[in-house]
């Protein structure tokens, strides 16, 4: 059997199951050990029975809606290969834009914290590009912390990873805190594509009734973990900007940047640390239990 025939059969199957072609191509490339750009040039390749058996098992999982990154066990982010697994969020392409914004603002030998680090994608991408930076990462999920440590070892990048709720308690002030927190509301969560809702961890996606529980904690608590003039860099939901800017302004944060992702959706905010202290609202135990993402 040739790859072209397999591809045609698989295309028919995914169309019948409303699976995007991009997911199929990702899984094909990984299964047959080639880059995405190679697929169209290797369609005449003959396939052996053992690889066909492996492919058929993988295709069954894809047709059940499982993300191709979980099937292959890896995802590409900022040109690096990361291990991924169910229980830890798959890094998204739009988050690469957040990394770019951090790199543009990072001075030499600064101390950076990536809250809600998940697989470690943001923290490790920053360290890969800026070896002079001291990078810390944190996550409430022990599974995420274990995976992030594996990725750091595989990529031979030296970062410190903490299992904690947002902020490590034993570290000095950070020059920059970056976070892609959970920001899906309860209502939005029910409308998510089943490939996300049924397979990726709810703990990494949901953030209370309005999707802003984590944002509130970051806005209220981050100042005590930043150096004077320190930056808070956030990824957020496309309808949340006004609410986040409003709560940040009420706490004295200075808005330094507001930007969109490559699809033109409002996605990024950067604030500088308030000059004065504001009252921090109490955080419930329920809120404290949600500090996890990828």
Where are the language model's segments positioned?
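Residue-level signal for inorganic ion chemistry
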Residues: 27, 65, 95, 122, ...
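Non-catalytic accessory regions of SAM-dependent methyltransferases
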Residues: 1-40, 45-47
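Conserved SAM/SAH cofactor-binding pocket of Class I
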Residues: 94-191
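Short, intrinsically disordered C-terminal tails of secreted or membrane-associated proteins
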Residues: 289-290
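Conserved AdoMet
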Residues: 29-101
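C-terminal lobe and adjacent flexible extensions of AdoMet/dcAdoMet transferase-like proteins
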Residues: 269-281, 293-294
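Mobile active-site "lid"/loop adjacent to the S-adenosyl-L-methionine
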Residues: 183-214
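Conserved Class I SAM-dependent methyltransferase catalytic core
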Residues: 209-271
């Amino acid at each position: 059997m040739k790859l072209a025939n397999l591809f045609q059969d698989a295309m028919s199957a995914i169309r019948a199951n409303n699976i995007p072609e991009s997911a199929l191509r990702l899984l094909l490339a990984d299964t047959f050990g080639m880059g995405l750009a190679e697929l169209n040039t290797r369609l005449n390749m003959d396939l052996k029975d053992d690889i066909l058996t492996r492919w058929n098992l993988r295709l069954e999982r894809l047709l059940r809606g499982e993300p191709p990154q979980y099937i292959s066990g890896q995802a590409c982010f900022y040109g690096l290969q990361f291990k991924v697994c169910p229980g830890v969020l798959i890094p998204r392409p739009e988050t690469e834009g957040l990394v770019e914004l951090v790199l543009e603002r990072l001075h030499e030998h600064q101390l950076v914290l990536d809250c809600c680090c998940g697989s470690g994608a943001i923290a490790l991408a920053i360290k890969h590009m800026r070896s002079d930076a001291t990078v810390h990462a944190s996550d409430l999920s022990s599974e995420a912390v274990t995976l992030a440590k594996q990725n750091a070892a595989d990529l031979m990048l030296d970062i410190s990873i903490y299992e904690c709720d947002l902020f490590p308690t034993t570290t000095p002030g950070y020059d920059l805190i970056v976070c892609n927190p959970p920001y899906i509301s309860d209502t939005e969560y029910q409308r998510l594509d089943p490939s996300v809702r049924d397979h990726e961890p709810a703990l990494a996606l949901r953030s209370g009734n309005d999707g802003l529980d984590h944002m509130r904690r970051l806005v209220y608590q981050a100042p005590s973990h930043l150096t004077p003039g320190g930056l808070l860099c956030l990824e957020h939901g496309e309808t949340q900007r006004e609410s986040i800017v409003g709560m940040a302004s009420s706490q004295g944060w200075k808005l330094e940047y507001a930007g969109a992702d490559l699809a033109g959706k409002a996605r990024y905010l950067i604030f500088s640390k308030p000059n004065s202290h504001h009252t921090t609202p109490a955080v419930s135990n329920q809120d404290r239990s949600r500090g996890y993402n990828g």
